[in-house]
Amino acid sequence: MLVFHGGNATTAYNLLACDFLMKDFHIYAVDSIGHPGKSAEVSLSPNNYDYGKWAGEVIEALGYDSICCFGGSFGAGILAKTMCAAPHKVKRAVLYVPSGIKNAPAINSMSMMFPMIMYWITHQDKWLKKCMLPMAVTEKNITEDIYETAKLSINHSKVKTGMPSNVKEKDMRKCEAPTLVMAAEKDCLFPAKGVLPRAERIIKNVKTYLLEGRGHMSSLRDEEKQMIVEFLKG
């Protein structure tokens, strides 16, 4: 299985959240190109299929004709782009709180802009936490490891603000891979009320799941982790 991490993070950190997959799958985890980590420091456009073409090249370089894939947030957007640009290389797919299906209008994230600017100016932790709160919904979802990862990325790398754009229906329908789309009810970036209906419309072989009462940053329950494993095993 190939795993794609979220924006402005690293795959090493992402594996903490994907540890439930390791018992049943051989995991390949790459640092997304242009993001923090060890991949090339080359920024690809999130507005076309460059990320999908890159991921297709990664799958080919690993020696697979096709592979199961899991992606969250920005990484799910990369996976969605891959399903369009290299549809036959994706065997089964899980898109978790995904970008690239039905992104919310940019105005929805404006509440994070002022705290982010204040953090850049003052470097006071309270401002970074206020910036993250719309995504977390409650402070308890801003765990120490999530906070420290975000802080290090912001302090030491050039933050990517543009999310993968919505894929086109005609391109997504080229992919026949069984796909599970999981979207959060209170996600300010990619709300379930937009993501799930469009996923059902544009993805040929899709199953959708609502993460009730949760925002963009939240934890999977044990039964949800098991559902993902069973889906990927087919």
Feature names for model-found ranges:
Residues 214-223:
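Catalytic histidine-centered segment of alpha/beta-hydrolase-like enzymes
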